[in-house]
């Protein structure tokens, strides 16, 4: 058998092996997550938040200076799966998944939301991953903002713990429209961590943010998957 005949056979075998590995790992992850008592895990929210802030997001603590971080989440602008794939959502930014290139209304960069007291801080980043804009929404603006749940469909429906929401933040000009999830992910392309414990941690932190936001502002309250 010639080498030219062996090459496609080897490729097929390797591809099949990789596909089986990914499928098996995803199945194991789903089983662990589905069997997790998230109400009990929620008691670990503070520990999980401190761990992520220290290991993955120290720049948020630097930006907040002396202000306390009560809760945090990731955010993105509305972005279709096809567009995101075209822009290659593959890289990592400070240990987290990125979203592409420019700001709110065109191509995307990662955004971070931090709840501190009654204020909500929005951090936007440049193409180098550095924070280049810091907006603060006070109580008055948040009382006139909106948060609505995104209907689940297709693959996202299977990831019910990572429910998406549209967040419309009031400004002096037009509202800033963002998408946030009940999990530390930037977009609806599957970015959920492959490690089951990291997945549990990401879900708890995302839900903690939504719970604290809803507790402060009833107009920004949505149903939380881990309490349903």
Please report, for each region that a protein language model flagged, where it lies by residue.
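Short alpha-helical interface patches
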Residues: 2-7, 24-27, 139-141
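Cytosolic-side junction of a single-pass transmembrane alpha-helix
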Residues: 14-27
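Anionic N-terminal interaction surfaces
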Residues: 24-113
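Hydrophobic, Leu/Ile/Phe/Ala-enriched alpha-helical segments that form helix-helix packing faces
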Residues: 56, 60, 64, 117-120, ...
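Beta-strand secondary-structure signal
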Residues: 166-168
